[in-house]
Regions:
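Bacterial carbohydrate/catabolite-sensing allosteric modules
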Residues: 3-8, 13-234
Length: 234
């Protein structure tokens, strides 16, 4: 039979209902055979984890948008059962609250962490007359969909609408306009995960941080409020 000394689990599915119990059994079996397990995503499981600290990056993003004059926002979330989406949404709400800004409940919709679903969600918001000057997508895939939807709607980004994402996927700097986003240090996350696995196998202390800082990357998809037409002042 095949055997691995170390296993690294990644992805938001670590919290999917029905999957957690199966995952727990798998991890216990691996550890019973002397293997080491590390998690690289937000989770409530009792094993060592290294996770991206997106809260600080999201706070930077809000400071950036508020500094540009934005006060009315839409938020596109991921699936409710994914801890990644829940935590990012909470961080965004908290950062807005520090500026005395509350989200209009009508402006919070699920984009499913998917491009097409996010595009449809933005189109519905505009059709329903919900007012916002910036849309914050909780991952980059949804932001790509919003850029495509904005183009179909005749909204100029960023003159009429600012669009942001989270992750900093390689494609984001190639978009038109390039996407303002929060960079999640995936390469560093993987490297630290491997170091933690090896330290557990070798039974030595692991001294590196277990939460990795994320940073704001400002590109061309965000702009100052008031530059666009009334069509974009939503």
């Amino acid at each position: 039979s095949q055997h691995a000394d170390g296993i690294i689990f990644v992805g938001g599915g670590l919290q999917v209902p029905g999957h957690v119990d199966r995952l727990r059994r798998q991890v216990e079996a691996i550890e019973a055979e002397g293997g080491a397990v590390v998690m690289l995503a937000p989770n409530d499981l009792p094993w060592p984890s290294i996770v991206p600290d997106t809260d600080a990056g999201i706070a930077e993003l809000v400071e950036h948008l508020v500094g540009l004059g934005h006060r009315s926002f839409a938020m596109l979330t991921g699936p409710d059962h994914l801890k990644t989406s829940v935590e990012r949404a909470a961080a965004f709400r908290s950062a807005l609250a520090r500026h005395g800004i509350a989200l209009d409940p009508r402006a919070v919709v699920s984009g499913g962490f998917e491009r097409l679903q996010a595009a449809e969600a933005l189109e519905r918001l505009v059709e329903q007359g919900v007012r916002f000057t910036a849309v914050v997508c909780l991952n980059d895939q949804m932001a790509v969909g919003c850029l495509q939807a904005a183009r179909r709607l005749g909204l100029r980004v960023p003159r009429d609408l600012s669009v942001t994402g989270i992750d900093d996927l390689p494609v984001t700097e190639l978009l038109d306009p390039p996407l303002t986003t929060v960079r999640v240090p995936m390469r560093e996350l993987g490297r630290r995960g491997m170091e933690l696995v090896l330290s557990r196998l070798e039974e030595r202390p692991f001294e590196a941080p277990t939460a990795l800082a994320c940073e704001l990357v400002v590109r061309g998809s965000t702009g100052r409020v008031g530059r666009g037409s009334r069509k974009g002042e939503r």
